[in-house]
Amino acid sequence: MSQRLIGQTMFSVRHGTEHRAERALQDLAGLLPASAGHMNHRVLRSFGMSPLGSALRDEGREAALGDVHFVFETEWDSLEAHDEFYSSQSVQQIYGTLHSILTSGPFEVLYDAVVEEPQHDNAAV
């Protein structure tokens, strides 16, 4: 039986190279609508750190902001659909364009939903 899952691919790049990462992520996002099993996606870029939500001391927060962090979040109706997308030649080529600018990652964590807000006409209620 298929199980819906969410994948979050995380990576960091040097300041000044974020435009290259954004272009690669736009290319990846462009492949998703035609992918079997794709349900949803979003691309996130860091802009700061929360002193309230972070356990890092001041110097740790500053060090962590030395790079630009990205999250490529995808939602799939099955692990098989996810794996088919990520093993494709097109995705691997796009990932290859990132290697020269990465400071960490990419790595992906897979999730299944534990708590979700109820939906009504595609809006949380």
Which residues does each predicted region cover?
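Short strand-loop junctions, especially beta-strand C-caps/beta-turns
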Residues: M10-G16, L79
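Glycine-rich beta-strand-turn "strand-cap" elements at beta-sheet edges
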Residues: M1-R4, N40-L65, I94-V125
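Short amphipathic alpha-helical segments
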Residues: T17-M49, S90-L98
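Short amphipathic alpha-helices within nucleic acid-binding modules
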Residues: H19-E22, D77-S88
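Internal catalytic or translocation cores that form aromatic/hydrophobic pockets or channels
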Residues: V68
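Active-site-flanking beta-strand signature of metal-NTP-handling nucleotidyl enzymes
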Residues: L5-S12, V71-F72
